[in-house]
């Protein structure tokens, strides 16, 4: 412990135990406890208590003061547990009967403050820290702590109840470590006394008629099997599995959600092998007995296992497919495609759930689609994967939602009415439909998928969220479509689809809802980025009014839309698609740069300006015509606009653009390989000097040095990195250091106050490169980078500052001794 903190500690302990003194808030107490944990990790707790007896006095006074605040009492319990985690310190505290007074009946259990959840939570957390060694087990047994933990499992505070269950698992594992670690225990005996008591309690709870009791027992077992992979857990399952299996005989099955969690946790445990028949028998029974709400998660969990009996995997997959199979049977006159309906008998419970209400029907279908979406990309998914059937079922679900499905039975008619306009199911189905694009399927079904997506995009009743999902799914299908072998054109289905798609996209770009316009622009950007070089796509796009509409949206009243329009137009321009190639559109093609520069200069919102800077950076990096025509003028103009911006992200993006220009001018950063022979880089002085003059001419030095003193730390950090790269790049050329002898740094030093004040030198190109670089080498950029890497409150986070603040709250410090922040 630091001497400064040790000097403040007695006064702080006096403040904490004095009910008349105002105590700092719980956050300060939490930080104080964290500090003590750090201290005890580095030194002996016994030595700490012996050198600072005020800590023992603090714990002793807690037992005597009746009206102590609940926060300080909870802190003291946790602090005592932290000290007692070391067994020798546990014995030291036992000598003074401190621990029985804190954690036994004489302590807070008999006080009125026990009614405060914070105190009960502190008691549990203190015991959790204390229970690290065999002496702690005897202490728990001798003072009835385990029985108190049992009662706290049903606490009215969910946090306390959860912590009690976690503590029970920890005590069980500690008991087994002290007993038969590494050796499986016999079901009938040889359990350590503490473990035996816990197991008896769990068995009793599993047999209880009260569902909360069953839930508590199942949660304890789930946590145990999740945390402990020792052989004794196998004996634990052998002992308790009959009790667990008996829950399936009740109607209704109690705590079904916790029951599923337990089965999956046991199945995932490495202690159990796929040959464990009793476990898989229980799982198979559960798949038959549970309701649809809980069967789906259990089936998904089984299918995600790497090792599982094949018969059980088949059963689980059939359970997972039942809701979609019911949908297909209710809407298809002829038998559906093989694979989905084979072996999937009508399940009365599933049908009842689909017909019960709109919420239950939507919930079941959404969960099923989400489970299948999660399963589809996994290597252990069922094989063969019924791609065609799933595609057909998903299209059918979407048609039920838009009212175009043809019912084949009364169930189908009911589903048509229930799912009509159901946005929740539409979103889930579109997500899964997008995932199915990664698989193969017959051309007829692919055509159906694209058709239903186009209908969703075209339907006037589609909500903004549905349209966004439809755009995303359409993009995935288009990008995954096969191309004609040996040809740069798209496959046979896509050109016609694009000719139908772009008129719909035009309408969505004019939609009154800004979210729809934004989604349409994002779709256009992604499609152009991937397909900008495809002849079919270029022809269809330029034949439409989409580029002109996207250009008009640069003036949209909503800033998010303007930002998306900037990104879209930047991408279209990079591909030569922002305007038709006819001569009458030449002016439109040339004016885009000025339009974007105007947005950067005058737009009142930050999002469009940030988007413009990202577009300009990409243009410079990719050699866009507007950037390549006069690169220095382009960079100078953009940096000048960015330097005046009040948004720190715009200024940071300006530094990114400057770094790109720097790399193009001086070469990319060197790669450092520890195994490579370092060859000296030699560059003629004249070309290097000219390159540096170009950097001065575009105002890069002014911009970077102003940013170095920026009040926003990310900007200063980025500028520091840029200047370090520049300095290291220059340092590799010995010719510059030899050129011109001693540079005159007077002009650069005169400009330094302007840079600190955030002002650029006027004019920007009047600096001598050698003088600027000489000053650059004189700056401690490494030290500045280290300083910038520290958090803004690194001083206030110190333990000494914390103790001073807490003492100041109690009025123990005078003048400016406190470091209140």
Curated annotation (Swiss-Prot):
The modification Phosphoserine is found at residue 742. GO terms for molecular function: ribonuclease inhibitor activity. Changing residue 59 to P: In RMFSL; uncertain significance. Its main location: nucleus. One of its GO terms (cellular component) is cytosol. Ubiquitinated by NEDD4, NEDD4L and ITCH; mono- and polyubiquitinated forms are detected. Component of a multiprotein complex required for the assembly of the RNA endonuclease module of the integrator complex. Associates with INTS9 and INTS11 in the cytoplasm and blocks the active site of INTS11 to inhibit the endonuclease activity of INTS11 before formation of the full integrator complex. Following dissociation of WDR73 of the complex, BRAT1 facilitates the nuclear import of the INTS9-INTS11 heterodimer. In the nucleus, INTS4 is integrated to the INTS9-INTS11 heterodimer and BRAT1 is released from the mature RNA endonuclease module by inositol hexakisphosphate (InsP6). It is found in: Nucleus; Cytoplasm. It is linked to Rigidity and multifocal seizure syndrome, lethal neonatal: A lethal, neonatal, neurologic disorder characterized by episodic jerking that is apparent in utero, lack of psychomotor development, axial and limb rigidity, frequent multifocal seizures, and dysautonomia. At birth, affected individuals have small heads, overlapping cranial sutures, small or absent fontanels, and depressed frontal bones. Infants show poorly responsive focal jerks of the tongue, face and arms in a nearly continuous sequence throughout life. Signal peptide: none annotated. It comes from Homo sapiens. Residues 741-767 are annotated as: Disordered. Belongs to the BRAT1 family. It holds the Pfam family HEAT. Ubiquitously expressed. Zn(2+) binds at residue 820. The keyword Phosphoprotein applies. Keywords: Cytoplasm, Disease variant, DNA damage, Epilepsy, Nucleus, Phosphoprotein, Repeat, Ubl conjugation. HEAT repeats lie at residues 495-531, 544-576. This is Integrator complex assembly factor BRAT1. Transmembrane segments: none annotated. Residues 100-200 are annotated as: Required for interaction with NDFIP1. The keyword Phosphoprotein applies. Changing residue 609 to W: In NEDCAS; abolished interaction with INTS9 and INTS11. A motif (BRAT1-like motif) lies at residues 819-821. The BRAT1-like motif mediates inhibition of the endonuclease activity of INTS11 by forming hyrogen bond and hydrophobic interactions with the active site of INTS11: Cys-820 coordinates one of the two active site zinc ions of INTS11.
